[in-house]
Regions:
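Short, acidic Gly/Pro/Ser/Thr-rich loop/turn segments
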Residues: 96-98, 157-159, 225
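Short, acidic, Ser/Thr-enriched surface-loop or helix-capping motifs
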Residues: 104, 160, 229
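Short glycine-aspartate micro-motif
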Residues: 88-92, 147-151, 215-219, 225-227
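Glycine-rich phosphate-binding loop and adjoining helix at the ATP-binding site
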Residues: 109-214, 350-361
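ATP-binding/phosphotransfer module of carbohydrate and carboxylate kinases, centering on a glycine-rich
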Residues: 1-67, 71-146, 253, 265-406
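Glycine/GP-enriched mid-protein hinge/lid loop-to-helix segment characteristic of carbohydrate kinases
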Residues: 112-114, 120-125, 174, 181-309
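Short glycine-rich anion-binding loops that position phosphate/pyrophosphate groups of nucleotides
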Residues: 155-158, 222-223, 344
Length: 406
């Protein structure tokens, strides 16, 4: 009997969370909006909408605003979300450093700092990371109204449901319970996610894919990875890790990849691989304005934009191989838009046509029809993916319900 009662209580809590999320989502994404409009769009009873909006108002999560009636008569009362008073500490943990940014709930950055983290063990990295977060919070104490979440994104394999880091490319981790440890240290709701998957979600909320529900983001940096959005949600699969596009084999006779295979996309389309190819060609005597002392990815992109033949050839070469992998992904997922992210997009006028050429010849006609291939709008906001995890938790009701109950 007790089991049935507990299940019933659980179901009631879930319904409360889902209904609250439905109302908050409409206010956040379509506000100013009236209670009548919320009831119509959510298909909730007007009494339920009134109750939920009262709770949100009392908690300070929404506010009422006057809107001029279309008839010119009495002003109608509408509702918008209150974004200024609730803050998230968003962390992008890299291989050697951390970028920490303070966001309000609109996605506005209130401050950002960079911290070197050269540690090489799980324990020392966690200790240094937590010291950096504590220092950051102390530095921004005057701007902080209410800290509602800490979110961390990182490269590697992550179990977002359990909040556990399974693998990182540069240090050995053993089921690193990062979320539980953050909660214990800072006493605030915490999240962890994969950096590129989270960036794809951020692009959906704030960037180039706001206007579509299905998209693919491919980012080139130290490695090459993808984030896939399906029906407005990150596609994660059973264990939370999907999108290793960098390990699609595009050249069976190619270089050996760190994963152990040969000819992975990452051996061609990652910053280090691009820089290495340019150095090889320069050493072989190919003419270019680039020099061995200055052939960073940024310098290569600038040279390509200026028409440097060697730089342009290298970027086009990357684009063709990247295009092959992107074409495979398009045929699998049929997205509404493809986004390319990373420093290489500085040479988008050279890169994108090479990718598009592959799409035109290797993707089903119906799938490539009216399919935009664009560059990321969030390239210079490295921690925005972490904030997207907190935003999602507000929109799906998980974090929202905790705030209403606190």
């Amino acid at each position: 009997m007790s089991t049935g009662g507990q299940a019933q209580i659980g179901n009631v809590d879930l319904v409360k969370q889902l209904n609250g999320a439905a109302v908050y989502r409409l206010i956040d994404q379509q506000g100013p909006i009236s209670r009548i409009q919320i009831a119509e769009l959510s298909q909730l009873a007007p009494a339920s909408v009134t109750k939920i909006t009262r709770q949100l108002l009392e908690r300070g999560l929404i506010k009422e605003v006057d809107q001029q009636a279309s008839t010119g008569g009495r002003r109608a009362i509408s509702i918008v979300s209150e974004t200024r008073h609730f803050h998230t500490v968003a962390v992008r943990l890299g291989r050697h450093d951390a970028t920490i940014t303070l966001y309000d709930m609109s996605g506005k950055s209130l401050g950002e700092e960079h911290y070197p983290l050269p540690e090489r063990t799980q324990e020392t990295l966690e200790n240094a990371l937590f010291i950096a977060i504590a220092q950051f919070i102390e530095n921004y104490q005057r701007k902080l109204r209410e800290l509602i979440a800490i979110a961390v994104i990182l490269p590697g394999l992550v179990d977002p449901a359990l909040g556990v880091v399974r693998y990182m490319p540069h240090i050995s981790v053993n089921n690193w319970a990062l979320v539980d440890n953050l909660k214990q240290r800072f006493n605030v709701t915490s999240f962890v996610g994969h950096d590129i998957r989270s960036l794809a979600l951020a692009e959906h909320y704030f960037g180039a894919t706001r206007d579509c529900e299905d998209s693919i983001l491919v980012r080139l940096h130290r490695g090459t990875g993808a984030g896939i959005i399906v029906n407005g949600q990150i596609f994660l699969g059973n264990n939370g890790n999907v999108g290793e596009i960098g390990h699609i084999q595009i050249d069976p006779l190619g270089e050996r990849c760190h994963c152990g295979n040969f000819g992975c996309l990452e051996t061609v389309a990652a910053n280090a691989a691009i820089e290495h190819r340019v150095r090889q060609l320069l050493t072989q005597g190919y003419p270019s304005k680039l020099t061995l002392d200055d052939c960073s990815i940024s310098a290569i992109c600038k040279a390509a934009n200026r028409g440097d033949l060697l730089a342009s050839e290298v970027i086009e070469h990357v684009g063709r191989y990247l295009g092959k992998a992107v074409a495979i992904a398009i045929n699998l997922f049929n997205p509404q838009k493809v986004v390319i992210a990373g420093e290489i997009t500085e040479a988008e006028k050279v890169l994108l046509p090479a990718i598009q050429s592959c799409i035109n010849t290797q993707v089903l006609k119906d799938f490539r029809k009216n399919l935009p291939v664009v560059t990321s709008e969030l390239n210079h906001r490295s921690a925005i993916g972490a904030f997207a995890l907190a935003k999602r938790a507000m929109l799906n009701g998980v974090l929202l319900q905790r705030l209403l109950e606190s």
